[in-house]
């Protein structure tokens, strides 16, 4: 039975049984992405565009996991009301919701909520406002050729570097990020700042280029040498040559 207390954290187990959750949707555009600024508590700014395409969700704490659940992928489906197709659709976690209405709660974009409907019944399903859905964690897949990217956040400097990690396939979510500056022989752990953003506040100035090591929830590691150049700039995206499972 669904209660109003959060359930156990959802971990990276695949092929698992379907669990039950409550679903709502948010945003001023019932057919579009949400939130209205196309951002959210994970730190993304473009959830209306590929590869998210507006198919996004706010998870409550067992799903969001204080930001460590950002980017995780879920199949969702509904059986009732009659407008539900019963066919699973894929959503990615890009935001957090704080409503204690169920053990598990997906606050979906209007587009994602409507995607659970039979063809042509999307608007009717959205009129339900709230329903029970079934969900399960699945591996994240991105279009062929998509590589992991690093967005250096505004305000970063030689004594404060913040990275937003995007487009990680497989587990989707990252549980550790380590950085190796030019003048270091060892990787230095970064701290989880908020959402999908990781930061480091070194005592001595940082000097690039920087190598980055990522660890996924399932324990997979990727290392990209010198992915961030010596002349890096804030509010800039740097694309790696790597992808989990590639």
From Swiss-Prot:
GO terms for biological process: plant-type cell wall loosening; sexual reproduction. It is found in: Secreted. Transmembrane segments: none annotated. PANTHER family: EXPANSIN-B1 (PTHR31692:SF21), EXPANSIN-B3 (PTHR31692). It comes from Cynodon dactylon. It holds the Pfam family Expansin_C. Residues 39-145 form the Expansin-like EG45 domain. Residues 159-240 form the Expansin-like CBD domain. Belongs to the expansin family. Expansin B subfamily. It comes from the Eukaryota. The lineage of its organism: Eukaryota, Viridiplantae, Streptophyta, Embryophyta, Tracheophyta. This is Major pollen allergen Cyn d 1. The keyword Protease does not apply. Keywords: Allergen, Glycoprotein, Secreted. PROSITE patterns: EXPANSIN_CBD, EXPANSIN_EG45. Glycans are attached at residue 9. GO terms for cellular component: extracellular region. Coiled coil: none annotated. CDD domains: DPBB_EXPB_N (cd22275).
């Amino acid at each position: 039975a669904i209660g109003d207390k959060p359930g156990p954290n959802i971990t990276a187990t695949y092929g698992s049984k379907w669990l039950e959750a409550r679903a709502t949707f948010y945003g001023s555009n019932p057919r579009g992405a949400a939130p209205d600024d196309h951002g959210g508590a994970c730190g993304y700014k473009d959830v209306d565009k590929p590869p998210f395409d507006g198919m996004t969700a706010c998870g409550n704490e067992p799903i969001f996991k204080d930001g460590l659940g950002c980017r995780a992928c879920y199949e969702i489906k509904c059986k009732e009301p009659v407008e539900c197709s019963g066919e699973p659709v894929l959503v990615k976690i890009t935001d957090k919701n704080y409503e204690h209405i169920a053990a598990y709660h997906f606050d979906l974009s209007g587009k994602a909520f409507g995607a659970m409907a039979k063809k042509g019944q999307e608007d009717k399903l959205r009129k339900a406002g709230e329903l029970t859905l079934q969900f399960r964690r699945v591996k994240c897949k991105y279009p062929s050729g998509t590589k992991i990217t690093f967005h250096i956040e505004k305000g970063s400097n030689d004594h404060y570097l913040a990275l937003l990690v995007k487009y990680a396939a497989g587990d989707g979510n990252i549980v550790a990020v380590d950085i190796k500056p030019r003048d270091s022989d060892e990787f230095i752990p970064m701290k989880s700042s908020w959402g999908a953003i990781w930061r480091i506040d070194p005592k001595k100035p940082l000097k690039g280029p920087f190598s980055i090591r990522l660890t996924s929830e399932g324990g997979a590691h990727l290392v990209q040498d010198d992915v961030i150049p010596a002349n890096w700039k804030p509010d800039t995206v740097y694309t790696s040559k790597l992808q989990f499972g590639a």
